[in-house]
Amino acid sequence: MXVNFDETSKNNDKLSNNITDWQQNIEKSATSFLNHFIRISPKQNSNKKELLAPNQDIYLRENIRLRLQLAIMAVPRQQNELYKQSLEAVSSWVRSYFDTNAEVTQNFLKLVDGLTDTSIYVDVPEQLKSLTLLDKYLNRTALDVQKVEIEADKAIDTMPQVEAVKPTQSESQQ
């Protein structure tokens, strides 16, 4: 059976009314059916979007959300490879399954591509200057401490002092 996917020939599609041509009529009917209803073609255009079942859309969005969370968690740990792999996976999925002509999708992809190009390594000094200053402050010598003089009020010194009265033996026995 010769199936023509590109064009159908009009003259071979006509069925005969003769009962003895039943095999040719079945073949022509099957060929016509295959040419018009079932199309099998290789994927030549890579711009075509992947098709998802309606319930699979939820899983795709959750996978994208998970990858974005992995990228977020990789930042404080400075795991640059995990960060980049997660963002590249998100970018790939969005390009494959979403309409890249939509403005929202284009803005999202620009943002993800910009984040992918950003390094998450933080350059911090090995030793802070405040540590040496704090060390000097805590280890300063006694000469650095200023003397504080306390002057007593002379009025307190000139007051008569009352002598303490000692109890007698008879008072202490009671």
UniProtKB/Swiss-Prot annotation:
UniProt superkingdom: Bacteria
Pfam family name, one: HemX
Family the entry assigns: To E.coli HemX C-terminal region.
Name of this protein: Uncharacterized protein HI_0602.1
Organism: Haemophilus influenzae (strain ATCC 51907 / DSM 11121 / KW20 / Rd)
